[in-house]
């Protein structure tokens, strides 16, 4: 600014009348009145100059400034020096990194004195704050694949990065569940003695007999069938519920493990959802102007190296593209006539009816496939051919996978026809796909419940004796675990088959066939909604089956590890950046919300099995009990009387009613506090707008007075 004041003055003088030309101002006059420089120093934008560097001059402070401008510059310098004298460490000054480093070197001794000053409470608070910051930095440095996620976000957008971030989060959940399972289930099982073997065929009871082991030598085809279906040698192994012996302490730890895993997953998902909600509300609100916020505030000045800089540039570019797409669609919707609006809503209603019809047909097909599986397994031809028997056992899984493979592309074709924005289209595709996947799982569980409980009729002939269908399902918990095991395994095989047989051959075809045909065959985009819903579906299957198949979280951990590297290889070798992107802020909130929905859905069959369905009489740690939960009161009765009274008090109304009242009061207080903060924020926004208007008016009046003063 000081090197060429003439050009600077001309630029200001030609901009909307804020400054008159230098010649029009004439020579300095001794008449009283504020100068233009002093008026402009009152603008909000002038205050930001103090944070750029100690040597930056205020608005209008040119090299040949008048005497009033010199006084303004002197006053401005005094304000800056006052800020420098404040007892703030260099790291807290709102300056660029280079200026803060220079300030720290000049005032190293003063920073040490400032840090050591204050009361003992202040010093402990600062020490605790710094320890907390260092702990967060250490935990952040321990996060796996941090650089890989940054690279993905820079090259393919933040939406694709959110998929891999969710995959890493789910991997953490499965690792925690596996560690808890090993500590609370496997170790007590082996420390309590060698588990007993399976019941023999000669053991009879009112609930029939149960012999899970195959007798004699078996062929390789049978071994492969047992591996893929969970039967044979795997049926009586730590993989499934029926293996664990009926020991009271083991039964309690087994049940506590299930509740602990559910609680930990709930808390971690809620924490992630709240963090994503903050970002979503900030992005969707009008508190920040989207374009200016990303252009002026999104850059990280701590980046080092050309690679990091290019990645950050790509991320900002993708975010701006999303904003521009959203703006175009909103403008088109704003200029629609009444007839166009009616036509759009009619199209939306018809398309939603089509979606409902497709979903209904898919659910009926899943129910039919599950019901026919039991009938087909009893056919002699199926029993003689292992491959055909394997196909019949996998019939529900195959049908669910087929539905999940066919219908989501149909939903993607329907969504653009409804006239929504890109973010809204993504939300509708996700909602329909998640409803398809999770509801298909619910239909499968309902069909299994119908077989286990004889359709809910406890007086039926097959269920009257033991409370469950002991003739077809002598150990129904293991059968349910086997179904979830097959779903998990088939999902992994499907992902491998799609990557190896479809995606990579398409890329090879692109290289072998130049021209339009090769480009059409090789152009692939990473479909974030489908991939995310695949993760949530797989995790929901694990939550449903982990109680009946305790090693399922460990298997899912291995699966997610393979999936991460496979998807990464597929992304960088066969996929191109998406032509249409969507907001990562909405994804960061919506994906955990759908995951929370999957956790809620998985808890329903688990809680129903624990409280209402009688456990199997021939397998599992709860055999002989009227219900799985009955083991808890029986274990409590063996505790000291004081402990019993306290635990039973927690389940009475004398404890529940005050807890409900206190929770209601705290919730009402939180809501009232949030409303008051919201009103305060609205008032501050209005005040900020008023102050800005006042300053603009005063600046214009000052310009007018300054330009007319010499003529008087």
Swiss-Prot record:
Record topological domains on the Cytoplasmic side: 190-249, 370-394, 447-483, 566-592, 678-712
pH influence on activity: Optimum pH is 7.4 for chloride transport activity. Transport activity is suppressed at pH 5.5.
TM helices/strands, residue ranges: 169-189, 250-270, 349-369, 395-415, 426-446, 484-504, 543-565, 593-613, 655-677
Disordered: annotated span: 1-39
Temperature dependence of activity: Optimum temperature is approximately 40 degrees Celsius for chloride transport activity. Transport activity is decreased at higher and lower temperatures.
Subcellular location: Membrane
Pfam families: TMC (PF07810)
Stated name of the protein: Voltage-gated chloride channel TMC4
Organism of derivation: Homo sapiens
